[in-house]
Design a protein with these regions (language model features):
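Eukaryotic terminal intrinsically disordered regions
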Residues: 6, 173-180
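Short, hydrophobic/amphipathic alpha-helical patches that form generic packing surfaces
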Residues: 116-123, 169-176
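Short linear, low-complexity motifs centered on an aromatic residue
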Residues: 124-149
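Compositionally biased, intrinsically disordered low-complexity regions enriched for acidic
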Residues: 12-116, 128, 146-169, 180
Length: 180
């Protein structure tokens, strides 16, 4: 059985080379099948493709790196390559801080994911694994659940007018805020 697992993993190994506005000749290896073999503590409710189609980050996130990810992720993606546009967001609310704030707070791993958590998630979903960085980002994702708890505690189910900014931020972290 473990032999089959090894050969299955070998089949999925692929090197991805990134050349976009933020990374030149950055390389990473896909060691897991796409969307599979996630850490047991990491159970996102939305895929990157679903998030992009719903409307996240004002549509201005990763507009220059489509070549890195599957084409179908962008087929229904709500994007604006020129500027951040809150009306693109599912809940029509600005719910993210700037990249400079993320850097100041130490949330960015410049070497691997200079765009932040969502870039990490997209690459993790694709099959890249970096154990220490994965553990750090999964801890951050789990800690974000406190926002879900606040919406559940303070809002009637599916009352989208109750805490829409917090709901939008939950979408940014792959929690499906449409269901709460």
């Amino acid at each position: 059985m473990s032999k089959n697992r090894k050969s299955s993993r070998k089949k999925h190994r692929k090197i991805v080379v990134v050349n976009d506005k933020m990374q030149k000749n950055y390389r990473y290896e896909l060691t897991e099948p796409m969307g599979k073999n996630f850490d047991l503590l990491f159970r996102p409710e939305l895929t990157p493709k679903q998030m992009l189609a719903l409307g996240v980050f004002g549509g201005h996130y990763m507009t220059d790196c489509k070549k890195e990810f599957p084409r179908d992720w962008f087929a229904k993606a709500k994007l604006n390559p020129k500027k951040h546009d809150d009306t693109i967001n599912y809940f029509d609310k600005h719910a993210s801080q700037s990249l400079s704030v993320w850097r100041q707070k130490g949330w960015i791993n410049e070497e691997h994911d200079p765009r932040g958590w969502f870039q990490w998630y997209c690459r993790y979903y694709m099959g890249r694994r970096i154990p220490d960085e994965d553990a750090r980002q999964i801890r951050r994702w789990r800690a974000y659940k406190r926002h879900l708890t606040q919406v559940v505690k303070n809002c009637r189910p599916r009352d989208y007018y109750c805490r829409p900014k917090q709901r939008q931020s939950l979408l940014h972290w792959a929690y499906d805020a449409r269901k709460i």
